[in-house]
Amino acid sequence: MSNVSSKGKSLSAKPGVEHWITRPTADGDIKLFLWQKAMTGGATSAGTRRGTVLFVHGSSMASRPTFDLEVPGRADSSPMDWFAARGFDTWTMDNEGYGLSDKHRNINFNIENGADDLAAATDYITRTTGAKQFLIYGISSGALKAAVFAERHPER
């Protein structure tokens, strides 16, 4: 995807970067998959990025097909690319039980668990990039996970 900034300079998202984190639970550790895209041209340091967006999927889908689907001929099909091209550091993750993240615990993957996953993800993103506050965008039950997370962690 490519866009043109107000200065006529071409902006585009970098290829995605895969990240893995481990979240401890009462039943043992779980591995969670995170996906990151940022703008090319070095605009990803804490001093130059416009913000950090964390996209949260719903209950019947995984993160990348929802937020980073690239459709040939449709430049704005990936919300991650759209925001990255405008200077945001963008992240998404597969909550436990979805996509590439662990699915081995015999539990109901509910809103509370999703909010716990978001806390682990934002801890990791803060350690990795220095971001301290997040713009959280959730769809379907992802919006509920984001709301519970925001209620628990208003400082983020």
Predicted features along the sequence, with ranges:
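N-terminal cap/lid segment of alpha/beta-hydrolase-fold proteins
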Residues: N3-T48
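Short, solvent-exposed loop/turn and secondary-structure capping segments
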Residues: L34, A46, P65-D68, S101-H104, ...
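Short, surface-exposed "cap/lid" segments of acyl-processing enzymes
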Residues: G41-F88
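Glycine-rich "HGGG/HGxG" loop immediately N-terminal to the catalytic nucleophile
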Residues: A62-P65, W91-F109
